[in-house]
Regions:
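Short, well-ordered beta-strand elements within core beta-sheets of diverse protein domains
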Residues: 50-57, 74-78, 175-176, 285-288, ...
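Hydrophobic face of amphipathic alpha-helices that form TPR/SEL1-like repeat modules
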Residues: 1-47, 72
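Rossmann-like NAD(P) dinucleotide-binding subdomain of oxidoreductase/dehydrogenase enzymes
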Residues: 143-295, 439
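ALDH superfamily catalytic-core signature
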Residues: 259-419, 482, 533-534
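Residue-level signal for inorganic ion chemistry
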Residues: 48, 86, 108, 198, ...
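Conserved C-terminal structural/oligomerization subdomain of aldehyde/semialdehyde dehydrogenase
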Residues: 47-53, 249, 402-405, 409-538
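Structural signal for hydrophobic packing residues in well-ordered secondary-structure cores
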Residues: 73, 77, 94-101, 105, ...
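Glycine-rich loop-to-alpha-helix module at the N-terminal edge of alpha/beta enzyme cores
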Residues: 51-143, 147
């Protein structure tokens, strides 16, 4: 692939999509056409036009991928390879992402509608994260045959009469179903640890936006991942359902909506297979009146509008102390109404003046699809009909060129005095919509923050460190940011495990805990001879 610059057009992106990896399934180490020969269109969110057709795999193609994986698993060479050696191959895949960031960023700009520079920045993070996963191969090797302290007087327990060690074995064949909002990042966050752990993995990207994920098949082929160890099958929900339902799939890792996650749990229950689910959120931004108001504005916009609000950790509930509510809302409205719309995410002609410095959120990108656009507008119509105040926004931007383009644009919207039991407060909208409630005391702030079934992330802003800590410790969420400045909001570090409470998920991603999700813990008991003897004669 040749590099693509920020000045390129949708037509030039299409030229890159003529590569085999973007037009065929990757099964058994080879690029193959779908058995039924079907395709599915993908649209450019800025205009609504179809710019490419993906291969549409079905249950039969999933069956082919599973047969290839079963052959590779039965061979045993991959599972028995040192994890550090598997990590070396994953590191080379990460390097391949790094070397093709400009191409992949342009593809994601076209596929998802996110600004090119944001896509490039995030993909750089995927490459770095892949290198981290690769480094954990050596850590996993070091964990093998680790002696267990079985008592020895601890707690009054006598030591065992035999030697015991722990091992971490790969699970087997794992199904990986990734989301559309950060396509390659979410996919590689599953693929990399699954492979380092020694599993055979089948990736099913989102049918809404999964083009960049298909490049992982090419990378796997280029670096020499053995045939059948990794496959990529694009398709619709039925394709994903076939992967989940297969008795040969011992674990499913999914990122997406809580509704789909619950269906995956239900489908996995009869075979008692494992699941790791990173699901929806309705994250709270709690702002105390001792917070610098300008920093509060910046943090609120970044928390709500990053990736157009299409991020599971989006802070779409603003819980603000009564003393600064009116001032904060006025400033938010003033800023939101000045942010330009990104009519062409690939070229990014509209960059914004960045006078208010909110990081990546200096343009309003389109939402990903017509169905998502319709869904968000439907929510807003329902909220207005229910009497919820639309403080700003609430519909399609009144710009002639945006309306003419057919793009999927939504005005950044603030809903005020939102009832706690309303859908505006309780449901994940997955768009640029912020719901607002106020509080007077710490106890009220905590109650408001914990007033939904979700628990993925939250932020507490205060200039008082002790207060920020007290409140953060009582919020039920997998990742809480306690800050006086808003810096680091939404940040992720590969070494820091995170996940959801409640309806936001099961299991953890990132860190050593994220790697362990793809392993089984086994104890091996030795008696009659020592562990050292066994290793010496192995």
């Amino acid at each position: 692939m040749t590099k693509i610059s920020k000045t390129n057009s949708i037509g030039q992106v299409q030229k890159h999509l003529t590569a085999e990896c973007f037009n065929k399934l990757f099964i058994g180490g080879q690029f193959v056409d779908p058995i039924d020969g079907q395709k599915m269109p993908t649209h450019y969110p800025a205009t609504g036009e179809v710019f490419h057709e993906l291969p549409k795999g079905n249950a039969n193609d999933i069956g082919s991928a599973i047969r290839a994986a079963k052959t590779a698993w039965a061979d045993g060479a991959w599972a028995n390879m040192p994890a550090s050696a598997r990590g070396d191959l994953v590191a080379r895949m990460a390097k391949g992402i790094e070397e093709n960031i400009e191409v992949l960023a342009a593809i994601e700009a076209a596929d998802v509608g996110k600004p090119f520079r944001q896509a490039a920045m995030v993909l750089g993070g995927a490459a770095s994260e892949g290198k981290y996963w690769a480094s954990l191969g050596a850590v996993l090797d070091a964990e093998q045959d680790k002696p267990v302290n079985s008592g020895g007087g601890m707690g009054g327990l006598p030591p065992t009469e035999w030697d015991v060690v722990y091992r971490r074995d790969p699970i087997g064949i794992v199904g990986l179903i990734s989301a559309w909002n950060y396509p390659l990042n979410v996919a590689f966050r599953k693929v990399a640890p699954a492979l380092v752990a020694g599993n055979c993995a089948i990736l099913k990207p989102s049918e809404i936006a999964g083009l960049s994920c298909m490049f992982l098949g090419k990378l796997a082929q280029d670096v020499g991942i053995p045939e059948g160890v990794f496959s990529v099958v694009t398709g619709d929900r039925e394709t994903g359902a076939a992967l989940v339902a297969s008795p040969s799939v011992s674990m499913v890792s999914f990122t997406g909506s809580s509704l789909t996650g619950s269906k995956i749990m239900e489908a996995s229950a009869p075979k008692l297979s494992q699941v790791a689910l990173e699901l929806g959120g309705k994250s709270a931004m709690v702002i105390f009146e001792d917070t610098d108001i300008e920093r509060a504005v910046e943090a609120t916009i970044k928390g709500c509008l990053t990736n157009g609000g299409q991020i599971c950790t989006a802070h779409t509930r603003l819980i603000v102390q009564e003393g600064i509510k009116d001032d904060l809302l006025k400033k938010l409205k003033n800023v939101l109404e000045k942010i330009p719309y990104c009519r062409d995410p690939i070229t990014e002609k509209e960059r914004g003046d960045r006078a208010w410095e909110t990081g990546v959120t200096d343009v309003i990108q389109p939402v990903v699809s017509a169905s998502q656009h319709e869904k968000i507008l439907g929510f807003l119509n329902e909220f207005e009909a229910a009497g919820i105040e639309i403080y700003t926004g609430g519909g399609v931007p009144d710009l002639a060129d945006v309306k003419k383009s057919g793009g999927y644009f939504i005005q950044p919207t603030i809903l005020t005095n939102v009832p706690r039991n309303s859908d505006a407060w309780q449901k994940e909208i997955f768009g640029p919509v912020l719901s607002v409630r106020s509080f007077s005391s710490e106890a009220e702030a905590i109650t408001e923050a914990n007033s939904t079934a979700f628990g993925l992330a939250s932020t507490v802003m205060s200039s008082d460190p002790a207060k920020a800590m007290r409140v953060a410790n009582r919020i039920r969420a997998g990742a809480v940011f306690a800050t006086s400045t808003g810096e680091g909001l939404l940040a992720e570090h590969p070494a820091v495990s995170r996940g959801g409470f409640g309806c936001s998920g099961v299991g953890r991603e990132l860190g050593i805990g994220g790697l362990h999700e793809y392993t089984e813990l086994k104890s091996v008991n030795y008696s009659g001879f020592s562990i050292a003897e066994a290793k010496e004669k192995a």
